[in-house]
């Protein structure tokens, strides 16, 4: 793992001892914010609740959407990010997606990154008042990478680059993708950065049933009915026509419908299953 933390070490807070015997050191509190796509906006409510009860983290580490929420908090722009999140509607979310037909992901990611930078600004991680890091995965090696320097939006973008959906992000000489591939809820990273108490937020818990195995009875090979077979043969041609058609059709193909999931929903659901299993193994 790449551990290049060069930021300032936050001073340990001292609180008066109730019996007048000097001071008592507060433990260093770490926050590990997990991935989970749109479910991750729940991290905002959790952060506000912690702060309302006087629990202020000294270390924040985020994976995927957790990196976005954690970075906004560390930079002091949680309100702006929440305002933007609340403004998202099905009719305008597509405007943030720069669709690509010949890249390593369906979405380039530049539009979304620009919107995040408009909300958070060109802040550097090493200039933040608290320790902050994001978790990403190196594509070629599978190594877990901790991003602790550079532009905060770049670190966020690398951490949420869901394979197949978003294009990988080049950081230094490494191509990085979503950190949830290796560490969905980065408790280990928070501890490595000095947290003595870690509050972990796993928004993907119980999304899928635990330990459920479904046995299918029947033949292992199913021969489709003639009309089904002809439908399957015609599907690729229709897919190509739709791919180059109007925006409304592209939205339908990308997000899918109740009857048939789209490309995005299939990939995200598959990723969520993997993420849930890894999280349960690591926590």
Residue ranges: model-predicted function:
Residues 120-131:
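A short alpha-helix-loop-beta-strand transition element characteristic
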Residues 45-53, 75-80, 150-153:
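A glycine- and small-aliphatic-rich helix-loop capping segment at beta-alpha/alpha-beta transitions
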Residues 2-10, 25-29, 78-115, 137-151, ...:
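Non-catalytic peripheral regions of patatin-like phospholipases
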Residues 34, 43, 56-75, 183:
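Catalytic nucleophile loop
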Residues 36, 46, 66, 134, ...:
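Conserved small-residue
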Residues 117, 154-168, 179-186:
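Active-site glycine-rich loop that binds ribose-phosphate moieties when present
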Residues 1-60, 267:
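Helix-rich "cap/lid" substructures immediately adjacent to catalytic or cofactor-binding pockets
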């Amino acid at each position: 793992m790449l551990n290049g933390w060069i930021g300032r070490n936050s001073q340990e807070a001292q609180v008066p001892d109730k019996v007048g015997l000097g001071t008592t050191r507060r433990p260093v509190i770490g926050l590990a914010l997990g991935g989970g796509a749109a479910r991750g906006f729940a991290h905002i409510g959790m952060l506000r609740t912690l702060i309302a009860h006087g629990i202020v983290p000294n270390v924040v580490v985020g994976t995927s959407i957790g990196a976005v929420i954690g970075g906004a908090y560390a930079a002091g722009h949680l309100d702006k990010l929440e305002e933007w999140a609340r403004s998202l509607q099905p009719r305008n979310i597509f405007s943030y997606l720069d669709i690509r037909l010949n890249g390593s992901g369906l979405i380039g990611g530049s539009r979304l990154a620009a919107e995040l930078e408009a909300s958070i600004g060109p802040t550097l991680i090493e200039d933040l008042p608290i320790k902050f890091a994001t978790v990403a995965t190196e594509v070629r090696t599978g190594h877990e990478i901790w991003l602790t320097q550079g532009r905060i939006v770049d670190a966020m973008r690398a951490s949420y680059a869901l394979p197949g959906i978003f294009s990988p992000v080049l950081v230094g000489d490494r191509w990085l993708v979503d950190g949830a591939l290796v560490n969905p809820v980065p408790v280990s990273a928070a501890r490595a950065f000095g947290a003595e108490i870690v509050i972990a937020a796993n928004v993907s818990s119980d999304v899928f049933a635990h330990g459920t195995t479904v046995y299918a009875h029947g033949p292992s090979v199913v021969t489709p009915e003639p009309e089904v077979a002809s439908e399957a043969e015609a599907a690729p041609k229709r897919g190509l026509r739709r791919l180059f058609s109007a925006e409304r059709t592209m939205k339908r193909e990308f997000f899918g419908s109740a009857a048939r999931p789209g490309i995005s929903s299939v990939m995200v659901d598959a990723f969520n299953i993997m993420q849930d299993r890894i999280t349960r193994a690591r926590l």
